[in-house]
Amino acid sequence: MIERIAVDPNVHFGKPFIAGTRITVQSVLELLDEGLSFDEIIKDYYPDLAIPDIQACIQYAIALVAAEEIHLTAVPA
């Protein structure tokens, strides 16, 4: 399903987007963060999307975070 996500340096400055569209993964994730349902995103914002496109955005974000090495630094009190 993650194959639905594309990255092209000539589209949105290389930010990941849903293949066949110009809709960024970030845009979809922000709508989810606002509490919108998959159906609301499709009906009210992106009628060309399908539920698997939104699921692919979530899977892409999970894969990105899982692959990243995180280093925490202590913050002085």
Language-model regions, residue ranges each:
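Basic, low-complexity segments
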Residues: M1-F13, P76
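Conserved phosphate-binding loops in nucleotide/dinucleotide-binding enzymes
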Residues: F17
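Long, charge-rich, low-complexity alpha-helical segments
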Residues: T24-A77
